[in-house]
Regions:
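Sec-dependent N-terminal signal peptides of Gram-positive bacterial secreted proteins and lipoproteins
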Residues: 2-22, 369-388
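A generic alpha-helix preference that emphasizes hydrophobic side chains
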Residues: 10, 17-19, 59, 108, ...
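Intrinsically disordered, low-complexity boundary segments flanking structured domains
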Residues: 16-21, 63-66, 283-285, 303-308
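Active-site-adjacent loops and short helices of periplasmic peptidoglycan-processing enzymes
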Residues: 22-181
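Domain-terminus/edge residues, biased toward the C-terminal soluble/receptor-binding domains
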Residues: 147-148, 159-164, 168-395
Length: 395
């Protein structure tokens, strides 16, 4: 027993700084970024800015660019040979063929749910007349979104030497596209049957729900040998929205991309939540005016933060950096400093602090007592002189 205690003490002193609340989950994905959509913060990342191949996740960009150039997604037209010309027959994932009566909606669902290269390529050819021109639109949109590590060469996502992106950039594209009503409806759909009734296909949402990811609202898969298994998704749990992008998972029949996402989602959904770290009216700091009046600096708002459930408010520190004494130059609303809320060395929140009062001239108590005393002495002296003068007259 004594030996065991010695060993435990040795371990404790050799490894004193291990964080028992460290994030932990098993994944094979090489690149990950998880956004909290409630506050647009990144809450987990792994090689998020590494330039990689992203496979069919780039069909998100193909689809949103197409939607923004289509007047009516229910418009019917016949597939023509040029819309499929040059596409490898193995890439005809949906099965669209020359002469088939389709709608833009069919092509969009085929692109996002079935991940059909024939859907993406046909959209590009129909809208721009050539894939090259359509890809120019995709790159223009990437530039508009401020994506500095993304460049497209084709519309369908097959690997090209000069085609690349990052999981972070894919997340930004997904966030942008999801704000479009048509895109959101399509990518959130379980399954779809084309307008001619020839094809029915399930999407990532249905697959995710079958695998136990019941919080999964929308998603797009991707795979090439170089990119590995990829997945971008949007989920929600307990009023918190998430956007997760994973890439480079080990290809297998075990759906490693979905398993990785489940492990990440489950960890954060079970161990993290939003809560107030300071409430409106809570005291930040007690300071004084030049005239010794006390001034209470208080929080102007509730501040909510997404934190590990094992971190409590008593573990947080409020640090004020600003004026400790206010002089007559200070008016209500003047900036007098800033404050931070910290957990260990991590800054959770930072805000400017403004004076709640206008400082007015006021005699300090000790000065006032001195003045009263002097006035009293002077008054008594004057009385003494008056009395003395009267006595002299009588004499």
């Amino acid at each position: 027993m004594k030996k065991l205690i010695k060993i435990l003490l040795l371990i404790f002193f050799i490894f004193p700084f291990i964080n028992v609340y460290a994030d932990y989950f098993e994944i094979t994905s090489k690149n990950v970024v998880l956004f909290n959509l409630n506050n647009n913060e990144i809450i987990y990342e792994k090689n998020k800015d590494e330039v990689i191949k992203v496979a069919s996740m780039q069909k998100i960009m193909t689809s949103i660019v197409a939607i923004e150039h289509i007047d009516n997604i229910d418009e019917e037209f016949y597939m023509e040979g040029y819309m499929l010309y040059g596409l490898d027959p193995e890439l005809l994932t949906v099965g669209f063929y020359d002469g088939e009566l389709v709608t833009y909606k069919d092509l969009l669902y085929g692109t996002l749910l079935k991940s059909g290269a024939d859907g993406a390529y046909s959209l590009a050819m129909k809208i721009s007349g050539s894939e090259e021109e359509f890809v120019n639109l995709m790159n223009q949109k990437a530039e508009e979104l401020g994506l500095k590590n993304t460049h497209f060469v084709n519309s369908h996502g097959l690997d090209e030497d000069t085609q690349f992106s990052t999981v972070y950039d894919i997340g930004i594209i997904m966030k942008y596209a999801y704000n479009n009503k048509i895109f959101k409806e399509i990518i959130s759909t379980d399954s779809y049957t084309t307008s001619d009734g020839l094809y029915t296909f399930d999407g990532p949402v249905k697959k995710a729900h079958n695998l136990g990811l019941n919080y999964f609202n929308a998603g797009k898969t991707g795979y090439t040998e170089e990119a590995g298994d990829c997945l971008v998704s949007i989920s929600s749990f307990n009023d918190v929205g998430y956007l997760l992008v994973t890439a480079g998972a080990e290809p297998s029949f075990e759906n490693k991309n979905f398993i990785d996402q489940k492990n990440i989602y489950d960890y954060y959904m079970n161990n993290y939540s939003f809560r107030n770290i300071i409430n409106k009216g809570d005291l930040i700091k007690r300071i004084k005016t030049k005239y010794d009046d006390e001034v209470l600096l208080k929080s102007k708002e509730d501040v909510s933060k997404y934190l590990n459930n094992n971190i409590f408010n008593k573990d947080l520190v409020i640090k004020y950096d600003g004026l400790e004494v206010l002089d007559r130059s200070i008016k209500t609303g003047d900036k007098i400093g800033k404050y931070q809320i910290l957990y260990k060395d991590e800054v959770l929140y930072e805000s400017d602090v403004y004076s709640p009062i206008t400082v007015k001239f006021k005699l300090k108590k000790e000065y006032l007592i001195t003045i009263i005393a002097l006035v009293t002495i002077l008054f008594m002296w004057l009385i003494y002189l008056r009395i003395r003068k009267i006595r002299r007259r009588k004499i």
